[in-house]
Amino acid sequence: LHVRSRRQRQMCIRDSDIIKDSGEFVVNLTTRKLCYATDYCGVKSGRNTDKFADMHLTPQQSVKIAAPAIKESPVNIECKVKDIIELGSHDMFIAEVVAVNVDEKLLDSKGALRLQDADLIAYSHGQYYTLGDNIGKFGYSVKK
């Protein structure tokens, strides 16, 4: 897994500094319901504000690392940093996934994530989008 974090932010605690110091982080997948909080946490500095409190989010103890997860997130991906690559204004963190925690209500009888029920969102080019519509199955392009 790799994530990028902007290094050149003034007057704020930079995520990249926190990740460098701790060597770990959690990727919390987010939902339509959490979209406002997701945006707020992405643009608001944590230097003088408690984003958990401001957005009524609950910190949750991770299973394998010390970094907290967000309880309201349906999927938490716990990661340990393996390498850091400086890319201009960003750092790229190459990380090992050490645990994945999923809200059991979103798993089917075989343990697969029911994506259509998760109501996950994605961010692309300044916009938030919902996910979840099944538009094909692996191999459908070559089946007759």
Please name every model-derived segment.
Residues 1-13:
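Single conserved hydrophobic/aromatic residue that forms the stacking wall/gate
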